Amino acid sequence: MNVLELSEQEIIRRNSMNELRAMGIEPYPAAEYVTNAFSTDIKKEFKDDAEPRHVSVAGRIMSRRVRGKASFIELQDSKGRIQVYITRDDICPGEDKEMYNTVFKRLLDLGDFIGIEGFVFRTQMGEISIHAQKLTVLAKSIKPLPIVKYKDGVAYDSFDDPELRYRQRYVDLIVNDGVKETFLKRATIIKTMRAVLDEAGYTEVETPILHSIPGGASARPFITHHNSLDMDLYLRIATELYLKRLIVGGFEGVYEIGKNFRNEGMDKNHNPEFTCMELYVQYKDYNWMMGFTEKLLERICIAVNGSTETTIDGKTISFKAPYRRLPILDAIKEKTGYDLNGKSEEEIRQVCRELKMEIDDTMGKGKLIDEIFGEFCEGTFIQPTFITDYPVEMSPLTKMHRSKPGLTERFELMVNGKELANAYSELNDPIDQEERFKEQLKLSEKGDDEAMFIDQDFLKALQYGMPPTSGIGIGIDRLTMLMTGQAFIQEVLFFPQMRPEKVTPKDAPAKFMELGIPEEWVAVIQKAGYNLVSDMKDVNPQKLHMDICGINKKYKLELANPTVKDVEGWVEKI
């Protein structure tokens, strides 16, 4: 890396790294460092009247107070933080005091990883700490951390800009309390979900991510190209059709937890790639699946929060069963006053106009109903509510309702105004399924880019016979948002998709050299803030001369300074 791209603090740290090596101390040792305790466990297990406990810990220096021959640091490990008391004569028992006077006091910085061996004690101020007897350098940090400081309960120098936090999640995890806890809870959610499904006897499977046909959901896919086969492939939008093939093949129940991809918008509830759990169980229907879902979510909530309740956006949400069950057309009537039962596509289109909705000719009956529900109903269901019995036009993979003509045995679980789960009594009639796919094809021809393709191989599988089956998909990201009280999906994804980072435009060196500027001075001029040749047009040559000569001196570049007359000549040529 060019030294001009470094900050003053980064240069100092690199010099410290080199000085450590000159002393014979490797700043990035290869050997294993053996630890026997974590910070939180040390504090939890400490007893004042017990024999001093000898521990070996490792972590990152997060703060320090140097006081001559004795100092305090705060060490952060994977579980928390603990204070360490370091004295010169304890870590340097012999004549050589360099480990304290030079290494600890001058060459170590905040963010560095060290190992500490010592014994646990309580300070006069009452804080459980480690009295260091040996210090080992484990990894040098050559980029300063944005250390958050607190005074009278107020945070200073906070690393709280959302874009920076999401782009540099590694820094966010280090310096911001609570961030890591959110992701540990996410891990608990997935672990508990797996436990429930495994205990029920269902088999976890893996199915392809690259699909020849995008199927299993109504969504716009990402398209890629396989060079060897010279064919387009699609990143999967759902695992549904492959999992159903496995039910055809004889599995009692199968589930998959994995990534799906949808080439759609990004907002606080949507990310182009997201994690979903899909489950399919033979000989079950959507009524059974509602009950199973209640038990699953209740257990997850208890595992994560210790109770069946969670709080988000200031609202307390209870996952204790049972949940309300409400047909979608009844929900629309309840929220808008319009009864859509038996209405034609044109009649529903007229309702949309009366509701002053933006619609277009590509929208079929199902899409129109979906738009009405999304705009006027969805956001009103805060407590868990099963919205059931969707029109067939909205549900091309769902079995027709056993007693309600024109409707299907489908439910979506709404929580905090958003869909959390989608489930069916699965359509297993191959003739009916083919007709539904053809209807989707007509929608595609009308311009609906979310309509499903016809999957001939899936139809072939159904023709061999699929038993009555119920299936469900649950969004892990949204579930984590609910269980951890996060309002933005980016807070529960380690590395959410981001728009391209803004980069300062710079002219190529050749453009500067056309003015007679030596190549070695181009980077210096750009460091001074003149990234484009045009930036120099109206500058005072004497100021430019002072700026670049100052940088040459500050960074010890040892370049031969140009004269003011040289600089005047550069500027005149612009």
Model regions and ranges:
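Class II aminoacyl-tRNA synthetase catalytic cores and aaRS-like
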Residues: 1-504
